[in-house]
């Protein structure tokens, strides 16, 4: 987690809705193992924001990296079928870990899997927006795969 400058810190302090993006390099050590200590700190901070009745959305990547480690791939997969297999295994693992950590702080979470088509004008975009708004209305922290 990085240090924020004063302007950003002030905007976050007053924000009703906060979206946090964490990437693979934040989630894992150089050897590919998950940084569970950092993940727990992140979840603690987001849970505390939620306890302040702020809307929180977590955007996370890392599914391919986590899945590759779990499948004992020696290098990052290059073929689509291997990437998809690693992503499927890794996404399930990440959600399991996030749900366990968030439940320690009595937070509700939901997994949101999106494609670029979900943001195009029309019914899909409306449904996507409605899903987010409904989850946030019920105090759920959406976890979005990036």
Question: Whereabouts are the PLM-identified features?
Answer:
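Nucleotide/pyrophosphate-binding catalytic subdomain
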Residues: 1-146
